[in-house]
Amino acid sequence: MDPNCSCATRDSCACASSCKCKECKCTSCKKSCCSCCPAGCTKCAQGCICKGASDKCSCCA
């Protein structure tokens, strides 16, 4: 169980330590969401890449 995820390892959760997912149900949380995405980002599951600022990333900019 990753401390930053609400799923158990048997659910194929592989979050990175920098990921702040609340509901990780994917195989690689690092690629499907990121802490820099603003709340309500509907594209957060399309491979975000953070770009520095806490509210900027490749899919929500």
From Swiss-Prot:
<feature type="region of interest" description="Alpha">
    <location>
        <begin position="30"/>
        <end position="61"/>
    </location>
</feature>
<keyword id="KW-0480">Metal-thiolate cluster</keyword>
<dbReference type="InterPro" id="IPR000006">
    <property type="entry name" value="Metalthion_vert"/>
</dbReference>
<feature type="binding site">
    <location>
        <position position="7"/>
    </location>
    <ligand>
        <name>a divalent metal cation 2</name>
    </ligand>
</feature>
<feature type="binding site">
    <location>
        <position position="5"/>
    </location>
    <ligand>
        <name>a divalent metal cation 1</name>
    </ligand>
</feature>
<feature type="binding site">
    <location>
        <position position="48"/>
    </location>
    <ligand>
        <name>a divalent metal cation 4</name>
    </ligand>
</feature>
<dbReference type="InterPro" id="IPR017854">
    <property type="entry name" value="Metalthion_dom_sf"/>
</dbReference>
<dbReference type="GO" id="GO:0071280">
    <property type="term" value="P:cellular response to copper ion"/>
</dbReference>
<feature type="binding site">
    <location>
        <position position="59"/>
    </location>
    <ligand>
        <name>a divalent metal cation 7</name>
    </ligand>
</feature>
<feature type="binding site">
    <location>
        <position position="60"/>
    </location>
    <ligand>
        <name>a divalent metal cation 7</name>
    </ligand>
</feature>
<feature type="binding site">
    <location>
        <position position="34"/>
    </location>
    <ligand>
        <name>a divalent metal cation 5</name>
    </ligand>
</feature>
<feature type="binding site">
    <location>
        <position position="15"/>
    </location>
    <ligand>
        <name>a divalent metal cation 3</name>
    </ligand>
</feature>
<feature type="binding site">
    <location>
        <position position="19"/>
    </location>
    <ligand>
        <name>a divalent metal cation 3</name>
    </ligand>
</feature>
<feature type="binding site">
    <location>
        <position position="13"/>
    </location>
    <ligand>
        <name>a divalent metal cation 2</name>
    </ligand>
</feature>
<feature type="binding site">
    <location>
        <position position="33"/>
    </location>
    <ligand>
        <name>a divalent metal cation 4</name>
    </ligand>
</feature>
<feature type="binding site">
    <location>
        <position position="44"/>
    </location>
    <ligand>
        <name>a divalent metal cation 4</name>
    </ligand>
</feature>
<dbReference type="GO" id="GO:0071276">
    <property type="term" value="P:cellular response to cadmium ion"/>
</dbReference>
<feature type="binding site">
    <location>
        <position position="41"/>
    </location>
    <ligand>
        <name>a divalent metal cation 6</name>
    </ligand>
</feature>
<feature type="binding site">
    <location>
        <position position="24"/>
    </location>
    <ligand>
        <name>a divalent metal cation 3</name>
    </ligand>
</feature>
<dbReference type="GO" id="GO:0071294">
    <property type="term" value="P:cellular response to zinc ion"/>
</dbReference>
<dbReference type="Pfam" id="PF00131">
    <property type="entry name" value="Metallothio"/>
</dbReference>
<keyword id="KW-0479">Metal-binding</keyword>
<feature type="binding site">
    <location>
        <position position="7"/>
    </location>
    <ligand>
        <name>a divalent metal cation 1</name>
    </ligand>
</feature>
<feature type="binding site">
    <location>
        <position position="26"/>
    </location>
    <ligand>
        <name>a divalent metal cation 2</name>
    </ligand>
</feature>
<keyword id="KW-0186">Copper</keyword>
<feature type="binding site">
    <location>
        <position position="34"/>
    </location>
    <ligand>
        <name>a divalent metal cation 4</name>
    </ligand>
</feature>
<dbReference type="GO" id="GO:0006882">
    <property type="term" value="P:intracellular zinc ion homeostasis"/>
</dbReference>
<feature type="binding site">
    <location>
        <position position="37"/>
    </location>
    <ligand>
        <name>a divalent metal cation 5</name>
    </ligand>
</feature>
<comment type="similarity">
    <text>Belongs to the metallothionein superfamily. Type 1 family.</text>
</comment>
<feature type="region of interest" description="Beta">
    <location>
        <begin position="1"/>
        <end position="29"/>
    </location>
</feature>
<protein>
    <recommendedName>
        <fullName>Metallothionein-2D</fullName>
    </recommendedName>
</protein>
<keyword id="KW-0104">Cadmium</keyword>
<feature type="binding site">
    <location>
        <position position="50"/>
    </location>
    <ligand>
        <name>a divalent metal cation 5</name>
    </ligand>
</feature>
<feature type="binding site">
    <location>
        <position position="24"/>
    </location>
    <ligand>
        <name>a divalent metal cation 1</name>
    </ligand>
</feature>
<comment type="subunit">
    <text>Monomer.</text>
</comment>
<feature type="binding site">
    <location>
        <position position="36"/>
    </location>
    <ligand>
        <name>a divalent metal cation 5</name>
    </ligand>
</feature>
<dbReference type="GO" id="GO:0005737">
    <property type="term" value="C:cytoplasm"/>
</dbReference>
<dbReference type="InterPro" id="IPR018064">
    <property type="entry name" value="Metalthion_vert_metal_BS"/>
</dbReference>
<feature type="binding site">
    <location>
        <position position="44"/>
    </location>
    <ligand>
        <name>a divalent metal cation 6</name>
    </ligand>
</feature>
<dbReference type="GO" id="GO:0005634">
    <property type="term" value="C:nucleus"/>
</dbReference>
<feature type="binding site">
    <location>
        <position position="50"/>
    </location>
    <ligand>
        <name>a divalent metal cation 7</name>
    </ligand>
</feature>
<feature type="binding site">
    <location>
        <position position="15"/>
    </location>
    <ligand>
        <name>a divalent metal cation 2</name>
    </ligand>
</feature>
